[in-house]
């Protein structure tokens, strides 16, 4: 791989923002100093006036650029998805390049409620793609199984209840085999009861993250599930999931997830799914250390001429603003997002640096820019890495999610001006990709 030297950038570290140089050798961050004079003709990135950040890790992303992780590639001409191996892999490649442009260095591709045979075929195509030797395969960190084990149609959101299945270890095993062992996150709403708790324990022991969302469960059911290993709230405050202010049954999912220090909260940060004032409220109540920003991006992201679509029995539409999706005929039911991570990061920086009236908190003070950068970087990079167990080095791999010596050089170089984060370089394990060439 050789050497890469990033010069005079503003480094967003773990606990401070400072100007310095970053030297990368064989894909690993080897030195971080105020000024590095390196012999041996390394590749040099001049980053004066730009930020050096850990790459974004999106743990909840269904697709982009016409690609859907469950159904393949959307054909605008026919209005149908092509799930053939060729179409799936071509669509995946386009989506991954769009993620690179947005500053993503790890993505967990997320599935919808769908026929099991459909998921097995798609996961098989993904497995074959990941087994080939190419830089894009480094970007994918497995699968988030969101829709398969949903239970209550009232809480379906934009998922099709026709394809909800009872929790079953055999189903998980079959999907795990089809994917080549790529399942990283599985959503098990606690209302499945003892069968769900048993599977939660099993998955936790296997190192798979167990999430809860789209859920009718009460707080006491969530408390039990959290005790068994559930530690992720699926797109918190969306889904929907039950909230209960009464004194019975320890509230609902919202209350249980806020109260537990074991649980990370996903937040879709497009400004539509969750009002910015609530985003500030959640960060203040939970602490930024347990919040993970996600896109929940759908295949429609980047499709300029798409207006309406069907996704395995569900009718959707692109809002006239082209900034979000909704279930056709139901303006209040959102259908994933068209958000890119760099835009989400810019949104969060803007919200954190503004004084804002809250709902659970009367007011939120404007943070200094450097404090906002540290918090946002944690929520987009460090926290998802910690959730997935890849923040620290070990078991033959280098950690990721922060700009530190000894970590994998999964980094971005970016310009932040006028509330817009523009990515100039994305580094995957030290290999430099200029976004203008993608």
Tell where the protein language model's regions lie, with residue ranges.
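Active-site core of metal-dependent hydrolases
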Residues: 176-305
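Conserved, mostly hydrophobic/aromatic
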Residues: 145, 233, 348
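Metal-associated gating/positioning segment near the N- to mid-region
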Residues: 50-118
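Metal-dependent enolase-superfamily TIM-barrel catalytic cores that perform enediolate-based chemistry
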Residues: 123-146, 153-217
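Active-site gating loops and adjacent loop-to-helix segments of metal-dependent hydrolytic enzymes
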Residues: 71-88, 97-106, 153-179, 224-264, ...
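Residue-level marker for buried hydrophobic side chains located in beta-strands
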Residues: 5, 55-57, 211-212, 293-294, ...
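His/Asp/Glu-enriched, well-ordered alpha-helical/loop segment
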Residues: 250-265, 284-295, 301-411
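Histidine-rich, glycine-flanked metal-binding segment
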Residues: 1-53
